[in-house]
Swiss-Prot record:
Catalysed reactions, as listed in the record: GTP + H2O = GDP + phosphate + H(+)
UniProt-annotated binding residues for GTP: 14-21, 153-156, 194-196
Protein name: Elongation factor 1-alpha
Main location group: cytoplasm
Record organism: Danio rerio
Top-level enzyme category: hydrolase
Amino acid sequence: MGKEKTHINIVVIGHVDSGKSTTTGHLIYKCGGIDKRTIEKFEKEAAEMGKGSFKYAWVLDKLKAERERGITIDIALWKFETSKYYVTIIDAPGHRDFIKNMITGTSQADCAVLIVAGGVGEFEAGISKNGQTREHALLAFTLGVKQLIVGVNKMDSTEPPYSQARFEEITKEVSAYIKKIGYNPASVAFVPISGWHGDNMLEASSNMGWFKGWKIERKEGNASGTTLLDALDAILPPSRPTDKPLRLPLQDVYKIGGIGTVPVGRVETGVLKPGMVVTFAPANVTTEVKSVEMHHESLTEATPGDNVGFNVKNVSVKDIRRGNVAGDSKNDPPMEAANFNAQVIILNHPGQISQGYAPVLDCHTAHIACKFAELKEKIDRRSGKKLEDNPKALKSGDAAIVEMVPGKPMCVESFSTYPPLGRFAVRDMRQTVAVGVIKSVEKKIGGAGKVTKSAQKAAKTK
């Protein structure tokens, strides 16, 4: 895939039976990275298993199964093309880990696509108090996904089919509740679709002659169109943070015979180049980058969004690990956090959270227990206004400013300076009990860490 078109990331959200998989599968299938051979293979398997009707969801089920088995699956399969963008689907929720993934997010979504089912009774179930639709939309907004598209799906199974009244009723209700969350409905495209039959997915549907298209208004420029694909094309392109200092959270560290130590991760901000001297925090190790590779090709530079492996000199696999963060030793190098203040929203905790609570935090690739050292203030979830000082406890639905202290060395940043390193999920009892964004970090001023010989040499020659 060349660099001609801009790459954007979307996350597809919505209730479990809204038809997310079918809709996503349809897009990947029709405009996507699935080659003919793979499709023929899937179709043959589907037929053999009596799924001969070949639902698009089958594509996605296959991909999910492969992804969950840890097969390094051709990431192109999760991509598709519009006339303007290469689109990558970051995660199709449905796994239990979706919320965690969305936060630790292999990346930040540029836009969320909310799929709601239009069928009789289905929409109501998804949006009810315990439906997932609300929670997903609230999460997307809290985590900084400011663009939204709503697909009103299963229009073929409304009563009567392709009902304009039903579409308008749902649009009105969804508008009201996304507005409560913080989205501006005027800037959100509402598209009536059938992910299964293909209505208004790539081409205007002949079944909904009443639909005159969607229109959105926003300060960056208005847009209009008919299909879901048009709406994806109207997403505002992201500004990628190449001008910020380097931050690269490590996903793994490999030892490769004849090459040495190779940390692997995704550049979140800044640029990584061979010859740079990088510091790993909280390990406090500084060394020179010998080479940078992506998909087995060496790069002269890696920019935000690139998943890369890079070879470092004189560092053993024991020195650095997943969850460490690499940065430029000469430009705001990353440091260990002594403590940090965060704004948290409690999602689903059966009891109460009080001072001293120490669950596991998932922040970028780090997975570390942190203590709620002080509950500073309880705030209004939407406006951020203070409701009370030093609350005794927090329960589901509450938002608060808290001071957190990591139980082990950890590197995090404030959301405003390095967004991907400033949002986290609080995990306990095998579920996400809260999400948070980091307001400020107190850095631990460490002594001199390990500086390898090659780093010293590189510093001298510069």
